[in-house]
Amino acid sequence: TTVRCKMPNGTEATCNVTVKPLATSLKLNASEIVLYIGQSFDINSSVPKGTAAYYRLYSSSNSKIAAVTRGGGVVKGVATGKTTVTCTLNNGKKAICDVYVVPKAKKISNVPLIGQSKLPTGCETCSATMLLNFYGYKISETTFADKYLVKKPFGYSNGSYTGPDPNCAFVGTPYSSNSYGAYAPIMVKCMNKYLSDKSYKAVEISGKSLEYLSGKYVAQGQPIMVWATINMSPSFKTTTWRVNYTDENAKYKLGSYYTWTAGEHCLLLTGYDKDYYYFNDPWTNARTRYSKSLVNTR
């Protein structure tokens, strides 16, 4: 409908009014965020199409850790810690976002360093072993490779190369420089095979930025395995093979074709600051750093 206001002198103004059903739900653009002290983030909220809300109020469970503008949803990190921001509609519907406020720099200094000299293509195994050693588990990279790493051969059959989905098994053997590697799902599975009677469990976290992972985990003293490239150099596609082995983590079907990305490399992320990420690198057998801008391209 249209509302009109007319002054005695004839001046007129109009306002178009649309009446919609009251929103029955509410969604924020993030369920959790990581902020540095002093950093801000706008938590936008939305309601289902065709509905409306008269107002939306934002609140923080601990404004000494992260403050939020009451009517706007802009969150600002104040001090390290965790808090929860809640958005409430006029009908009582709510949505929440967990907020982690972290220091601008963190380095975990006591992470054991293991080079891959015994396992030429075993960067994933060495990184997993470093992580296990950090949590106090006494296991060598060769023992992990021999007893816990799922390995499937790479070969040639019926006119094409054959091998496993690298999400489901190591392609070849880490003892050979002519082998390939493995991705996060199978490494998590292998680590949890070792940890089956232990208090810790390995968890795969995909689709998150290194900035998020640094704030959520490294800032809390937890190093993490990440996949990038050797020396952070550009990668390129190489060998293609027909997939002949999968498991519950498969991203490729049996009989389909997979093309390996050359230069794939697994490292242990141990720190960050304004400009750099810090790693335990099994390839160089060194604690090294790479610029954030470079790492984010790999």
Pin down the residues of each PLM region.
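Extracytoplasmic soluble-region selector
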Residues: 1-104
